[in-house]
Amino acid sequence: MRKTIMKYLPALAGIIFTAGWFLWIDGHVYENTNNKNADFDGPHIQWIYYLPGIFATLGMVMANIVDLSALNSNSLLFDGGATKVRVWLFISFAISFGCIGAALWIMVAVFLPPHNTNDAAQWPGIAITLQTSLIFLSSLLLVFKKVRQDDEYDQF
């Protein structure tokens, strides 16, 4: 059972990643469709609202291009490889958390009341928050798969 789950974990991460971007595209299309109505008074999506998703994707790539076998080093201070990997992973996860924070900020400051009084215009803000959260979740699943793959041969 465990091997089957580990086998399909990257596919699940890809589905979650795709769902995140799909939700954001859906939110943007929803906003553009509503803007064609003459009585729509909601906020308009600007190019800067794409940045949390783009940087969350960058953080996911950064977390998954690193070789995690370098973390198995015994010496913390003398081995530069393990320290570099730890710093790289810290930066990638800091970028991902920052993107979630930026998406929450955009949602609260632009798309939710009292800044936006139109209830129909709240979906893009929710979509951008879901997007960055799902991208981060897919990144965690892929890193977990890599960690468990390294531990697969350990019996203890």
UniProtKB/Swiss-Prot annotation:
UniProt main location, coarse: membrane
Pfam families: UPF0220
Record keywords: Membrane, Transmembrane, Transmembrane helix
Keyword Transmembrane helix on entry: yes
Annotated GO CC locations: membrane
Transmembrane segments: 5-25, 45-65, 87-107, 124-144
Keyword Acetylation: no
UniProt protein name: Transmembrane protein 50 homolog
Membrane topology: Multi-pass membrane protein
Annotated source species: Dictyostelium discoideum (Social amoeba)
Coiled-coil portions: none
Localization annotation: Membrane
InterPro entries in UniProt: UPF0220
Disulphides: none
GO term, biological process aspect, one: late endosome to vacuole transport via multivesicular body sorting pathway
Annotated family: Belongs to the UPF0220 family.
Domain of life according to the entry: Eukaryota
